[in-house]
Amino acid sequence: TGLRAIIAVHSSARGPAVGGTRMWNYASSAEALEDVLRLSRGMSYKNAVADLEMGGGKSVIIGDSRTQKTPELFRAFGRAVDTLGGLYYAAEDVGVSVEDIAEARKVTPYVLGLNDGPEASGDPSPVTAEGVYRSTLLAAKRLWNQDDLTGLTVSVQGIGHVGGYLADKLHAAGAKLIMTDVNTALLAEVAARTSAEIVAPDAIYDVKADIYAPCALGATLNPRTLDRLTVKAVVGAANNQLATPEIGQILFERGVLYAPDYVVNGGGIINVASELRARQTGGAYDASWVETKLSRLMDTLEEVLERSAAEKRPTHEIADAIA
């Protein structure tokens, strides 16, 4: 089938490793390996901070998700996951849809994020977006002491799965949006319904905004972008937003509120965890369990922000310590 994939299990201390499958056209297998290892480590922290009985794992399929997807490819991937015997469960991520996961499900039970069946949790993106939205409200309350986003400008980078749902929520809460994405057709569509201003991908760092929401790929907070950002807060859905831990230190010193990525974006994996839980107990998907876990995660974010201010330590260090 021409499948080239890497599955990384970072930790199974808390339970089976769970994490999404990303299909991306990596320049080399070395680049893919570096990405999957970084992402799998991030999942260990994300699952721990959300208090889920799961370890961290991640997988990548090397290829162009727009042109190289076939049902056979995902069945071959499913067979690879199956050989691990439940040590790792796969789910949707960048470039991989609910339909793709359903294809893998034909050959292995070790996939999550399905649409069919009583335990199915579906697309995790809306729940991820809800967590990012609530995190943004927390930041607005802390910095500007307001309960909505009226009068605030948010720059949204990436309006794919999560970014699109997030944009709708931010718009409804009164925020002015400036957005970018490499998918210009989708960008035009989302911008039209949220009255957003559109900018070129690299210009997103230079716009005048109050909050920056990175919702595309990781490491966008790096030496090249740091001095261009004029925002007071960073709250987004992307994984591994800080290129290095030092960037978190610099943001802290500059008085920029950085809401740690794996706390902010934990909604999706909580949703996926509910499906695993239902499957283990023979029960059904439980939306109220998801809501309880999500509110607790937001309490944790509040604790991170409060401790960061009190202890004069960067938020990413506090979050790591809690996880």
Describe these PLM feature segments:
Residues 88-92, 112-114, 179-181, 199-200, ...:
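General beta-strand structural signal in soluble alpha/beta enzymes
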Residues 4, 27-35, 68-72, 76, ...:
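Conserved active-site and cofactor/substrate-binding residues in soluble primary-metabolism enzymes
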Residues 1-119:
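N-terminal ligand-binding/catalytic initiation module
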Residues 184-260:
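Rossmann-like adenosine-cofactor binding region
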Residues 123-211:
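Glycine-rich phosphate/diphosphate-binding loop of Rossmann-like nucleotide-binding domains
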Residues 140, 232-322:
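Adenosine-phosphate binding glycine-rich loop
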Residues 47-53, 87-92, 144-153, 201, ...:
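Flexible, glycine/charged-enriched surface loops at secondary-structure junctions
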